[in-house]
A protein has these predicted regions:
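Structural recognition of alpha->loop->beta junctions
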Residues: 91-103, 151-165
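Acidic, Mg2+-coordinating phosphoryl-transfer loop and its flanking beta/alpha structural elements
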Residues: 120-155
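Substrate-recognition element of Asp-dependent hydrolases with the DxDx(T/V) motif
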Residues: 49-54, 58-92
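A short, structured active-site edge motif that brings together acidic residues
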Residues: 74-81, 89, 95-112
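A structural signal for isolated positions on well-ordered beta-strands in alpha/beta enzyme cores
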Residues: 72-74, 102, 120, 140
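Conserved Lys-Pro-Asp/Glu-containing loop-to-beta segment of HAD-superfamily phosphomonoesterases
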Residues: 3, 104-132
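Active-site neighborhood of HAD-like aspartate-dependent phosphohydrolases
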Residues: 1-46
């Protein structure tokens, strides 16, 4: 079985759309690294997670992947604070108790914490997918609608089942 790592923000829940809108409404420039970091560290993650919608039925899609018995499934998520980590783990253990959560401090690359070689990453951020591939991993871009970009793309997580036999 291959190891399959699935990103959280922008793949499972649409937290990025909601937080980017709030950043804009607050007048915080997304290019101001310190201000953005402060915003994410002080964010009420419990509230955000409870108010944010799943993307393309992601929880059921992950359950289908687990049921296929083709992959060792992990959630691999960047975090800005301990509170963010606790809230994500708490949420995921309620809805996907069979899946292990790997939290990565935002200052580190996902490839620093997890060896990508031969493993699959599904992520909405092209930078993470590209870095994963550099580490000899299989990077797949999650998109809400097909972009026909530089990476293999999926719009529903369970599409991964038929990509690997």
């Amino acid at each position: 079985m291959k190891n399959l790592y699935i990103d959280f923000d922008g793949v499972i829940l649409d937290t990025m759309e909601k937080t980017y809108k709030e950043l804009e409404e607050s007048g915080i420039d997304k290019k101001d690294h310190d201000a953005v970091t402060k915003y994410f560290r002080e964010l009420d993650w419990e509230k955000l997670i409870s108010e944010t919608k799943e993307i393309n039925n992601s929880i059921e899609e992950i359950k289908k992947i687990c049921a296929s018995k083709k992959f060792n499934v992990y959630i691999l998520t960047h975090i800005n604070s301990t509170n963010e980590m606790v809230q994500k783990i708490s949420y995921l253990h309620k809805v996907l108790p069979e899946v292990t959560v790997v939290s990565v401090p935002k200052e580190l690359s996902k490839t620093t914490v997890v060896n990508p070689c031969g493993a699959i990453l599904i992520d909405d951020y092209s930078g993470n997918v590209k870095e994963w591939q550099k580490g000899l991993g299989i990077g797949i871009k999650f998109v809400k609608e097909r972009e026909n970009g530089d990476f293999p793309e999926i719009t529903h997580l369970s599409e991964i089942i038929n990509m690997f036999n």
